[in-house]
Structures are given as C-alpha cells and as structure tokens.
A protein has these predicted regions:
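Acidic interaction surfaces
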Residues: 1-191
Length: 191
C-alpha cells in the first residue's frame, strides 16, 4: 500500500474540479485532508469508492483503508449536486444514487437547471419534476390567466366579461389545492 502522501497525490491528480457540479470531500483516513472532486465523475463511476478505483487508480487494500474510515462532504459548488449534499448528525453526505437519477431526469425533461431545482425544493421526486412543471410566471395571477387561456375558458366567454374576472381570487383558489410555486416556477401539486 502507498503512503498517505502518495494516496493524496493520486486522488488530487484525478480530482477534475472544473464545473459547478463539484463536492469537497474530507477523508479522516488521510489525516483530515480534503479535495474538490467533480461530482459528475463520481456519478459516472457509480460511487465515491468506484471513483477512487477508476479515476485515482487506488488498489483494493488502499480502497479498504480509506473506505473503512470516515469521510464527509464539507462543501459543494451548488448546481444540481447541491440538492444531494447535506448534513446529518454533524456529518456531511452526498447521495450519489439520487444525484445520478436526478441528472438523468433533468436531461430527459429538457428543463433549465433552476426550474428543475425549484421542483426538487418543493419535494417533487426528480423523475416527476418534468411532468409536474407548468412554466415560469411573474405572479400567481399571470399563471392563472395563462392557464385559463390554455384551457380555452377565456375563448368561451365574451370579451367584455373577461374584464370582470378577479384573477387574484382565481389564482388563490388554484394555488390552494392544485398548483405550487417556487421562485416563479409553477408545478402541479398532484404529481
């Protein structure tokens, strides 16, 4: 097995920290040493342990040495990866499996990252965010008016009557049961 310094060097050489999808890992086995790693590379490998093997070239005994001791995520660069890093019982973690699924769901949905993250913030599962998404609007009233237009309700009523619609009340009713909003992004509540 290589020395701790040699292990650090191998990991540092593989740590492609060039995107907004990076995580900072601290390894207790390596003396509390930390390094920024591209989370997309970790996801492509399948796990942090597999990344250490595939990207950093660690041998089985070296992997066992590192994996049998604590490690934690101490920071992230935001992006999508930030939604899958957190803290529990004082330790930082990275949920690689959920991050992998979310990357695929984001790509399939063809949504922009901020809208996708808004859906996740509302508690919508990553594989349902694209289906639940209704668009971006400046206000609940704008959303309600566009929804009624899309559903054909406005074309069915005389134009003079449209001026009497209380869009604030319509929006309030829609937002109570059927829809939810995060940072101007609107989603079905019943996904």
């Amino acid at each position: 097995m290589r020395t701790v310094t040699e292990l650090r060097t191998a990991i540092e050489a593989a740590a492609n920290h060039t995107t907004d999808e990076s995580i900072c890992i601290r390894w207790c086995a390596l003396g509390g040493w930390w390094v920024w790693i591209n989370a997309e590379d970790v996801a492509d490998a399948g796990s942090l342990s597999e990344w250490l093997e595939q990207y950093a070239g660690l041998e089985e005994d070296e992997l066992e040495f590192i994996n049998n001791q604590d490690w934690e995520v101490v920071d992230d660069d935001g992006g999508l990866v930030g939604e899958f890093c957190g803290y529990s019982n004082g330790w930082g973690y990275f949920n690689c499996d959920e991050y992998i699924a979310a990357r695929e769901a984001l790509e399939d949905s063809r949504m922009d990252l901020e809208a996708f993250k808004a859906g996740l913030a509302l508690g919508i599962p990553a594989d349902k965010v694209g289906e639940a998404y209704r668009g971006d609007y400046d206000s609940d009233e704008d959303f309600a008016q566009q929804l009624w237009e899309d559903c054909g309700y406005l074309s069915e009523m005389p134009e003079f009557a449209q001026h009497y619609i209380d869009w604030d009340a319509v929006a309030r009713d829609l937002m109570i049961n059927d829809f939810q909003e995060e940072d101007g992004h609107y989603f079905d509540r019943n996904w």
